Amino acid sequence: AFTENEWIDVLLRSTGMEPAHFNERTKWHLLTRMIAFVENNYNCCELGPRGTGKSHIYKEVSPNSILVSGGQTTVANLFYNMSRRQVGLVGMWDVVAFDEVAGISFKDKDGVQIMKDFMASGSFARGRDSISASASMMFVGNINQP
């Protein structure tokens, strides 16, 4: 049977990190990036220096997450396409991660409000319908610090 520390090392190795290079605090920090995969509607923002693997886990580690890059999205793409009557990314993925969070914008003027409502309650309104989804939202971005 594995000890707690051995389990932590296994989890970190499964994401491509070598635990021997990290102290205990850093290991726990790296593990917190994975909370969104096991906890519904967990929302978090991680800021850090470039090239530290902030978005790697959401793009490469799990088939149940999607990384939205490029900064711009639509309410139809993210939440609900009313013309197709189809739920968007929050209904299809366990984790929706936004890369370069500083550049996020919506083409729709009500996009930010719908996102805030979803993050607070796990549901959103489109037309006459109230729709629930369990996706977690992660926001990752760079800071200008070495």
Name the predicted role of every residue range.
Residues 51-54:
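Conserved glycine(s) of the Walker
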Residues 97-99, 117, 133-146:
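Structural recognition of the conserved hydrophobic beta-strand(s) that form the central parallel beta-sheet
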Residues 56, 60-108:
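AAA+/P-loop NTPase substrate/partner-engagement loops
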Residues 22-25, 104-112, 126:
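Conserved ATPase-coupling elements of RecA-like P-loop NTPase cores
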Residues 40-44:
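Pre-Walker A (Motif I) flank of P-loop NTPase domains
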Residues 85-86, 120-136:
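Conserved Walker
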Residues 18-37:
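Pre-Walker A adenine-sensing motif
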Residues 1-24:
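Charged, amphipathic alpha-helical linker segments immediately N-terminal to NTP-binding catalytic cores
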